[in-house]
A protein has these predicted regions:
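Conserved catalytic-core segment of clan PA serine endopeptidases
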Residues: 35-53, 57, 67-71, 87, ...
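Active-site region of chymotrypsin-like
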Residues: 45, 50-52, 57-61, 144-153, ...
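Beta-strand/loop subdomains of soluble extracytoplasmic proteins
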Residues: 114-123, 164-167, 176-194
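Extracytoplasmic
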Residues: 58-60, 74-76, 80, 101, ...
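Short coil-to-beta transition motif at edge beta-strands of beta-rich domains
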Residues: 48-53, 162-171
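Composition-driven, intrinsically disordered low-complexity tracts enriched in small residues
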Residues: 26-50, 281-306
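Secretory targeting and sorting signals
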Residues: 1-32
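Short, glycine-anchored, charge-dense loop/turn motifs used at functional sites
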Residues: 70-71, 77-81, 223-230
Length: 306
């Protein structure tokens, strides 16, 4: 069984030799939780661009071909998935990968879910399961190269936090299926096993169109209006347990916890855009929300031509 959507499903991911887990984040990155509204199952119209086009099927997870709002066609293209999907195994609590060599590959899909080519990574630009659950890879080809050979255009990572109650689609390349629902608030602290995430995206529940499963880990969360990536799918409560692996819980301000069996979550991706200098990740930039490694880090990633 492939890894679930997130770090949850750690056991399942471990069987595959994939990475998956949750991790603590600095208190400065914590966001105020928002209570879920009364959830009524709802039908969300799926837009054409919210299909499987520009998603990337990995051997253990889902992923997508992405770009920053400021990326140029001559920049090296990027692959986005979960930190727990890292090919080297689970990242430990406290671990941050920066500019690490990688040779993983994936199948780039069209809107119908058919493979239109193979993409190859050269390095992990950034990956962590501390406070967030993300892995961003640099690929061998530029956006222009990929567009020329396959016709695929990368999804744009939004530079702002998604709006509560906004309609979303979650295209899973692993399963060739798109889930649709809406955002139902944000969780200041979401805990699962040894890991903690902040400002997590809570999906509308109950909603049969948004029951993400193992293998949907790393799927982009696409806003149905802007058609931009506003988050990344990563976990859900399987059994109704509190704060255990595959059973994330919401931690309230007073320290009490709540958990709902079947409730699914995603993580923020606009954080990447708070850390860009000259179109490269700069963890030292003021206001950067991404978790920093223990040692100082200099900018890395695709550079904007001067």
């Amino acid at each position: 069984v492939p890894s679930r959507r997130t770090t949850s499903r750690l056991a399942a991911v471990a069987v595959l030799g994939a990475a998956g887990a949750i991790a603590p984040l600095s208190s400065s990155q914590a966001a105020e939780p928002s209570a879920p509204t009364s959830a009524q199952p709802q039908t969300v119209q799926r837009l054409q661009a919210a299909g499987l086009a520009s998603t990337i099927k990995l051997d253990n997870c889902s992923g997508s071909l992405v770009r920053y709002p400021t990326s140029t066609d001559t920049d090296k293209a990027m692959l986005l998935t979960n930190g727990h999907c890292y090919e080297g195994g689970f990242l430990s609590a406290g671990e941050v990968l920066v500019n690490k060599a990688s040779s993983r590959s994936g199948q780039l899909l069209d809107d119908a879910g058919s493979s239109i080519g193979t993409v190859q990574a050269t390095k992990v630009l950034y990956a962590t399961m501390i406070g967030n659950d993300v892995a961003l890879y640099e690929l061998t080809d530029t956006y222009a190269d990929i567009a020329s050979s396959t016709g695929a255009k990368a999804l744009t990572i939004s530079d702002s936090k998604p709006a509560d109650q906004s309609a979303i689609s979650i295209p899973s390349s692993y399963w060739g299926k798109t889930y649709s629902c809406s955002i139902n608030g944000f969780v200041g602290e979401l805990r699962e096993g040894d890991w903690t995430w902040h400002d997590s995206i809570r999906y509308a529940f109950p909603n049969p169109d948004c029951e993400t499963i193992h293998g949907t880990s790393g799927s982009p969360i696409v806003d149905n209006t802007s058609l931009e990536v506003v988050g990344i799918n990563n976990t859900g409560n399987d059994d109704g347990q509190q704060c255990t692996v595959n059973n994330p819980c919401e931690v309230n301000e007073d320290g009490t916890t709540t958990a709902t069996q079947g409730q699914n979550y995603g993580q923020q991706t606009y954080w990447f855009t708070t850390c860009l200098t000259d179109n490269a990740i700069d963890l030292s930039k003021d206001g950067c929300l991404l978790t920093k490694p223990a040692t100082a880090t200099k900018p890395h990633g695709p550079k904007k031509p001067h």
